[in-house]
Structure formats: structure tokens, C-alpha cells
Amino acid sequence: MTVINDSAVATELTELYLKYEKALCTNDVETLDNLFWDAPEVVRFGVRENLYGSDDVRAFRKGRSPVNVDREMFNLKVVTFDADTAAVTLEFRRAIDGVVRLGRQSQMWRKFPQGWKIVSAHVSFLPV
């Protein structure tokens, strides 16, 4: 039987996600790279890009401008499935060119022998 939202696993994933969020908002590329699965199967759908494989994700991170990357996060939801799979979703506000935009993000996480890794991610903005 699948255990949904074991409190210890959900707490662990929430802490890891907050580490990801801090790295994202401070452009800590090394931490971001370490949190993504290093595999050709990893996928990240961004606002303007579709990235397939860890090489694409790494290249995107390294080329991303470190200016104005902070955002206000809300409605963070972590749902765990047993001790090795989780979905993380949230909404955020971010100012782009003086306009506050509402966005959303979803990630699938999987626990490997080397720890938890993001295996799939999606980021998008709602229409203005």
C-alpha cells in the first residue's frame, strides 16, 4: 500500500525545496545543478524553453541572468508517495520589467541512492 504524505518525508522534501528556492533566487548554479537529476531523461519546461537532459538544464542555468531572479512564493504544496517519490507545486509573484507577474511551478522528485533529485520541472506564467 502506498503511503501518502508521510510527515517525515514531507518535511524532508519541504526543506529541500526551500533550499532549491533559495538557490534559484540567489542564482546559486552549483546547488541548482546538484538538485537536478544528472541524466539524459531529466526534463525542464521553462517560460521560453524546453530542456531535455541534464546538459541542457546546466547550460540554461549557466546562461541565465542573475539580475532580478527573486520572487515571492505562495501555495507551496508537497505530496509524497512512499519514501522515494514526491510532487512539489507552488505559485509565485515576480516583477518583470516593472510588471508583477503570477506564475506557477511543478516538480517531480525521486530519491536515488545519492539523494533526492528533481526529475521533471515545469515553470510558467499566467497571462497578463
Question: Which residues does each predicted region cover?
Answer:
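Short, low-complexity N-terminal intrinsically disordered segments enriched in polar/charged residues
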Residues: 1-35, 128
